[in-house]
């Protein structure tokens, strides 16, 4: 069901759109959690550390691909808000063509140099082979991952957040089955977990595209929609590439953090991996709000309804407090139990290290919520430069804290790097939005004054 977000109560629309996205994000985390749980329970702590050590590298590459996919969805939301269905179908056609090209460009070098990338991350010698077996398969499946995100981005661009959810639920069951079969029965080790994820993503992508074209006639492309239009390609990439670079820049900061954690040994790596998984699950309301605001702002910008943008962003600001509070409580109260889901009988040292990160992160969840809401909102408003630069600020904030705090404070100092990145970036994005808002209000007031003079 497509949803016009340019009419109706903004808070209600944002929440109704967000619920399926939240469930979808949780199932996306469920993919990763099932991989991690089964790897940790059946293959041991070293295998878990190996899979965990690839997380930031996956985020770097897949985040770039998925950022571009989200950018395509933003352009679809602009066309849908403007009620320009011919342009909308052209954006869909270009999205499909660019997905093929970009995924090929990303797949070849990452598969070829996966081991070298792990070496640059200071991956411990005892887990690097296991990590490489996992990440090579993930990189080989970039097309499947990007295709699903393009399909879901297009659907969300027209306000349909339910269809992507249905197929994620279906494919999550397949992922569980394949995890158990490929790891426990076939005994493919860490590679089996990667195969399960890629196959599940591929199934989800295929089904999503089939239903997308059958269910929504406005998305059904014809031969006339597939033509080379460099102007529109540039427009799509001008939105998609900053979003992609933002993911990648953030990922580089995470890689620096992961590299700093790796020097403390495989036990601490396993603890950090489990804690990061717990934090990701606890904070899923935040990227959910971000996705909703990108679509909401994109549609209303296309429709020229700036007052609705102001009201929606104000409502989202208040929702950030709820999201941050819920995430902090979950990390602090359920953290030990959730860490135990990822590591079978964790040692006291491992559990302590995991909870150290969660306690530090919980204090500063609110700035993290601001990042998702205001970064995605600004990107939906076709203001991609500052969100991209905010990623650079995240990178330097993490790096600076690691340089300053890692030696005197050890692992605790490294954990504080995320907090510094969230705080500085969240403030920058809020200030940027407020400046944009004041400029738009001033422009609208000037236009109204001119119209009154004419009358």
List the predicted regions and their residue ranges.
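Helix-terminus/linker motif at the lipid-water interface of multi-pass membrane proteins
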Residues: 26, 30-48, 118-125, 181-188, ...
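Transmembrane helical elements of multi-pass membrane transporters/channels
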Residues: 16-35, 137, 148, 171, ...
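Small-residue-rich hydrophobic transmembrane alpha-helices
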Residues: 48-108, 145-164, 271-335, 368-390
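Hydrophobic transmembrane alpha-helices of multi-pass small-molecule transporters
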Residues: 60, 175-179, 205-209, 281-284, ...
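Short alpha-helical transmembrane segments in multi-pass integral membrane proteins
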Residues: 1-18, 76-141, 185-241, 297-364, ...
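Short runs within selected transmembrane alpha-helices of multi-pass transporters and secretion channels
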Residues: 69, 137-156, 164-172, 193-206, ...
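Residue-level signal for short hydrophobic patches within transmembrane helices
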Residues: 7, 11-30, 34, 57, ...
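Interfacial/gating helices of multi-pass transporter permease domains
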Residues: 39-59, 125-130, 190-191, 232-239, ...
